[in-house]
């Protein structure tokens, strides 16, 4: 029996061959040699050796060689002089031919795989050159045109943000100034309203005084009328009394004429009349003077109140006009303030939207830059992996070259002619017991490489009997 040990390689792992993956940082090589020796109990003993080579990373490509060794003699064995049966030689030739046919088929498969491998290596080298060119372009040019466009757009966005910030600050200053003007106008309006209230209260007091003066004038007019009526009544009464006195005087005069000895009453009546006339004139003069003084006082008070009322009306009209103008101005300022606040809100909303758009653009550009960096890092990792694979494939190519050279040298050896073999008969009874078990020698060689350098190499020998 023979054993073939096959390990998975990076080539099969990369290009679809069977096997499992290994670490990319280190490689291990295994060399397994299996040797079998068969004892046939005669002078002819075929020996078959199989060698398997596994290269990094864990790949295995096997070739096997078969040789037929003839031993003319065995120590302690006596050979017969007769010819051996050629059926054994025919069987050996058939096995040898089958082995050669299988080896040719395997060699053809290996050649096909090797050609595919070379094509893939060339393709990978072209891809590697493209990646190297891109990497050199990225490293050599520094900032690409896309980066310049991004930076230019970022500068433009920053300039717009600064301009909007300045506009916002200017609008806020204007708003503060307008707020101060509005506060000052409100204070002035409050003062004008207070003055208006004071003027209205003064006007109300003046109206009260005018009403009182009017009532006093009416009262005085009624008093004057009553006094005039009283004067007329007194005058009429006085006239009647005078007439009565005159009538009495006439009667008395007649009696006096008739009676001379009676006292003179005319003088007494005249004195009484003079006294009454003086009293009436005095009362009339005092009443007229009091009436004139009262009328003059009331006229002066009425004129004074009329002047104050007219002045109060003028001031009230002036205050009303001022209040109306201030109200219109306040309404205009309110409208201006509302429009400015609306514009400021719109500008703030636009600024917030533009700032959000700028932030989104900045985030998108940063994401694109990060993606480009990650893609560059991925290309670098792929490039490093390809370098590792290339080194491993170079090692496998060198191994294949050695195997092919060994196979070519083996094929070039002359084959023995089994038909001319003459074997002597061996007395098996007198021969010592020969071990019919096959001997297998297993050589395990472990080579660990990292970045193309051998860092560890171990060999193990195992001898087994079957």
UniProtKB/Swiss-Prot annotation:
Chain spans, region Coil 1B: 154-245
Keywords: Acetylation, Cell membrane, Coiled coil, Cytoplasm, Cytoskeleton, Glycoprotein, Intermediate filament, Isopeptide bond, Membrane, Nucleus, Phosphoprotein, S-nitrosylation, Ubl conjugation
Bias (Low complexity): 1-13, 21-32
Residues bearing attached sugar chains per UniProt: 7, 33-34
Post-translational modification N6-succinyllysine, affected residues: 120, 129, 188, 294, 445
Cross-link (Glycyl lysine isopeptide (Lys-Gly) (interchain with G-Cter in SUMO1)): 445
Modification sites for Phosphotyrosine: 53, 61, 117
Residue ranges, annotated region (Linker 12): 246-268
UniProt site (Stutter): 351
Modified residues (Phosphoserine): 5, 7-10, 25-26, 34, 39, 42, 47, 49, 51, 55-56, 66, 72-73, 83, 87, 144, 214, 226, 299, 325, 409, 419-420, 430, 438, 459
Domain of life: Eukaryota
UniProt-annotated stretches for the region Coil 2: 269-407
N-acetylserine: residues carrying this PTM: 2
Residues with PTM N6-acetyllysine: 120, 129, 139, 168, 188, 223, 235, 294, 373, 445
Record comment regarding domains: The central alpha-helical coiled-coil IF rod domain mediates elementary homodimerization. The [IL]-x-C-x-x-[DE] motif is a proposed target motif for cysteine S-nitrosylation mediated by the iNOS-S100A8/A9 transnitrosylase complex.
Family: Belongs to the intermediate filament family.
Subunit structure of this chain's protein: Homomer assembled from elementary dimers. Identified in complexes that contain VIM, EZR, AHNAK, BFSP1, BFSP2, ANK2, PLEC, PRX and spectrin. Interacts with BCAS3. Interacts with LGSN. Interacts with SYNM. Interacts (via rod region) with PLEC (via CH 1 domain). Interacts with STK33. Interacts with LARP6. Interacts with RAB8B. Interacts with TOR1A; the interaction associates TOR1A with the cytoskeleton. Interacts with TOR1AIP1. Interacts with TOR1AIP1. Interacts with DIAPH1. Interacts with EPPK1; interaction is dependent of higher-order structure of intermediate filament.
Name recorded for this polypeptide: Vimentin
């Amino acid at each position: 029996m023979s054993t073939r040990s096959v390990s998975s390689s990076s080539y099969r792992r990369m290009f679809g061959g069977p096997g499992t993956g290994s670490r990319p940082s280190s490689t291990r090589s295994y060399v397994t040699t299996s040797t079998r020796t068969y004892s046939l109990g005669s002078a002819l003993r075929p020996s078959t050796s199989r060698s398997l080579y596994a290269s990094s990373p864990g790949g295995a490509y096997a070739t096997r060689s078969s040789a037929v060794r003839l031993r003319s003699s065995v120590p302690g064995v006596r050979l017969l002089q007769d010819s051996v049966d050629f059926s054994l030689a025919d069987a050996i030739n058939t096995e040898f031919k089958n082995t050669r046919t299988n080896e040719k088929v395997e060699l053809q498969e290996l050649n096909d795989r090797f050609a595919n491998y070379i094509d893939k290596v060339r393709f990978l080298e072209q891809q590697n050159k493209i990646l190297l060119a891109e990497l050199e372009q990225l490293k050599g040019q520094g900032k690409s045109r896309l980066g310049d466009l991004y930076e230019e757009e970022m500068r433009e966005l920053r300039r717009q943000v600064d301009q909007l910030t300045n506009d916002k600050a200017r609008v806020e200053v204007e708003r503060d100034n307008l707020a101060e003007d509005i506060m000052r106008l409100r204070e002035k309006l409050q003062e004008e309203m207070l003055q208006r209230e004071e003027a209205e209260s003064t006007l109300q007091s003046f109206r009260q005084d005018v009403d009182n003066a009017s009532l006093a004038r009416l009262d005085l007019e009624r008093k004057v009328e009553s006094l005039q009526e009283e004067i007329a009544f007194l005058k009429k009464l006085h006239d009647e009394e005078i007439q009565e006195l005159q009538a009495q005087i006439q009667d008395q005069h007649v009696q006096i004429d008739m009676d001379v000895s009676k006292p003179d009453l005319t003088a007494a009546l005249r004195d009484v009349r003079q006294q009454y006339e003086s009293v009436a004139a005095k009362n009339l003069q005092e009443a007229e003077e009091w009436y004139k003084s009262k009328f003059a006082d009331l006229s002066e008070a009425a004129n004074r109140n009329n002047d104050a009322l007219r002045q109060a009306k003028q001031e009230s009209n002036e205050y009303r006009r001022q209040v109306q103008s201030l109200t219109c101005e306040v309404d205009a300022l309110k409208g201006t303030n509302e429009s400015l606040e609306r514009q400021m809100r719109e500008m703030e909303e636009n600024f917030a939207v533009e700032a959000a758009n700028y932030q989104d653009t900045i985030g998108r550009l940063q994401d694109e830059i990060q993606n480009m960096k990650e893609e560059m890092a991925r290309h670098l990792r792929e490039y490093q992996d390809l370098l590792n694979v290339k080194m491993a494939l170079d090692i496998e190519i060198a191994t294949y070259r050695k195997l092919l050279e060994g196979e070519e040298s083996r094929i070039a050896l002359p084959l023995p002619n089994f038909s001319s073999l003459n074997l002597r008969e061996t007395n098996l009874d007198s021969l010592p017991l020969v071990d019919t078990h096959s001997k297998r020698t297993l050589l395990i060689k472990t080579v660990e490489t990292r970045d193309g350098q051998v860092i560890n190499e171990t060999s193990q020998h195992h001898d087994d009997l079957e």
